[in-house]
Amino acid sequence: MTATILVADDDAAIRTVLNQALSRAG
């Protein structure tokens, strides 16, 4: 449930982190 709250509250920040992870992976 905490993860859901974080996604809803800091969606932009999480997207940035995911983008960085995808960049490193790809």
From Swiss-Prot:
Compartment(s) of residence: Cytoplasm
Example of a GO cellular component annotation carried by this entry: cytoplasm
GO terms for biological process, alphabetical: nitrogen fixation; phosphorelay signal transduction system
Domain Response regulatory positions: 4-26
Keywords: Activator, ATP-binding, Cytoplasm, DNA-binding, Nitrogen fixation, Nucleotide-binding, Phosphoprotein, Repressor, Transcription, Transcription regulation, Two-component regulatory system
Record-level Gene Ontology MF annotations: ATP binding; DNA binding
PROSITE patterns in alphabetical order: RESPONSE_REGULATORY (PS50110)
Posttranslational modification: Phosphorylated and dephosphorylated by NtrB.
Subcellular location, principal: cytoplasm
InterPro entries: Sig_transdc_resp-reg_receiver
Function: Member of the two-component regulatory system NtrB/NtrC, which controls expression of the nitrogen-regulated (ntr) genes in response to nitrogen limitation. Phosphorylated NtrC binds directly to DNA and stimulates the formation of open promoter-sigma54-RNA polymerase complexes.
Descriptive protein name: DNA-binding transcriptional regulator NtrC
The organism of origin for this protein: Rhizobium leguminosarum bv. phaseoli
